[in-house]
Amino acid sequence: MDNIQQLKQWIDGSDRIVFFGGAGVSTESGIPDFRSVDGLYNQKYDYPPETILSHSFFMAHPEEYYKFHRDKLVVDGAKPNRAHLRLAELEREGKLQPVITQNIDGLHQAAGSKNVLELHGSIHRCYCMRCGRPYPAERVNHGTGVPHCDCGGIIRPDIVFYEECLDDDVVSKAVHYIREAEVLIVGGTSLAVYPAAGLLNYYRGSKLVLINRSATPYDDQANLIIHEKIGEVFAQV
């Protein structure tokens, strides 16, 4: 039995599956990832992307941040790929519990997934930093300059910048689901970003599946490793 057949067997036999995904899940939808050879961290800007995506940079240089945001984070026309669609289908079948994602693109919801835990927020939600008023993402993602609220405060995307903490409620839910999972499928992530990657340490089962095109720090703990494109894998299960 090859690895994809083994994964299919585990999926067919379980109704406590949890999926934990990163940027590689969306690259087949045309959204660049961060750490691959051709990802955002290897492209050249006036500042490194990890600097631009920090809280302190946003506060000091909101104009520069929004140039990057509109140029690189907003990908018009991106559609869910085979991985997003199959995961939504597994949820409808009562097999998949939540999708836990590090992505901010909203493609899991676009595919039909209802139970999505967004560790790093979403570019599809925005709010005023002064009064908290929510704003439609369209105003931020396709506007010009730095968007301001009627109260004068800066409108920011509801994403987690570097130097900021993850949402406690989202993290506690993710920990609960991972602890209770029978099958934990981890896909499209280098597992290099903490604290998100550390969530895998809460898994207590014996069916940890890693789907990634390159090695990860957790390979020695995995029960099944598949080095293929994640969309191609999910098209077969």
Residue map of PLM features:
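Conserved catalytic core of sirtuin-type NAD+-dependent deacylases
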Residues: M1-V237
